[in-house]
Amino acid sequence: MAKKAKSRIINVRLISMAMTGYFYTFTRPRTSLPMSMLKYDPIVRRKVLFLEQKRKGRS
């Protein structure tokens, strides 16, 4: 049997670099570079850098 084709769009989780545990979820094309952006973190009440988290435990 042939393998299932991978989706062109993936869901990614952006984690706060303030280490508060707050995150945003976005969709991006699989071929694009990993996301990073400045967004508002309500726990520290300021804009902080959010970086894309590596997927763990998926096979």
From Swiss-Prot:
A cellular component term from Gene Ontology for this protein is:
ribonucleoprotein complex
Q: Which UniProt keywords apply?
A: Mitochondrion, Ribonucleoprotein, Ribosomal protein
Keyword Ribosomal protein (UniProt): yes
Positions the record marks as coiled coil are none
| Cell compartment(s), UniProt | Mitochondrion
User: What biological process terms from GO does the record include?
Assistant: translation
Report the principal subcellular site: mitochondrion
Entry keyword annotation includes Ribosomal protein: yes
Q: Which InterPro entries match?
A: Mitoribosomal_protein_bL33 (IPR052008), Ribosomal_bL33 (IPR001705), Ribosomal_bL33_sf (IPR038584), Ribosomal_zn-bd (IPR011332)
Q: Which GO terms describe its molecular function?
A: structural constituent of ribosome
Complex formation: Component of the mitochondrial large ribosomal subunit (mt-LSU). Mature N.crassa 74S mitochondrial ribosomes consist of a small (37S) and a large (54S) subunit. The 37S small subunit contains a 16S ribosomal RNA (16S mt-rRNA) and 32 different proteins. The 54S large subunit contains a 23S rRNA (23S mt-rRNA) and 42 different proteins. bL33m stabilizes the tRNA acceptor stem in the E-site.
Family designation:
Belongs to the bacterial ribosomal protein bL33 family.
Q: What does this protein do?
A: Component of the mitochondrial ribosome (mitoribosome), a dedicated translation machinery responsible for the synthesis of mitochondrial genome-encoded proteins, including at least some of the essential transmembrane subunits of the mitochondrial respiratory chain. The mitoribosomes are attached to the mitochondrial inner membrane and translation products are cotranslationally integrated into the membrane.
Fetch the NCBIfam families from UniProt.
rpmG_bact
Q: Which protein, by its recorded name, is this?
A: Large ribosomal subunit protein bL33m
Organism of this sequence: Neurospora crassa (strain ATCC 24698 / 74-OR23-1A / CBS 708.71 / DSM 1257 / FGSC 987)
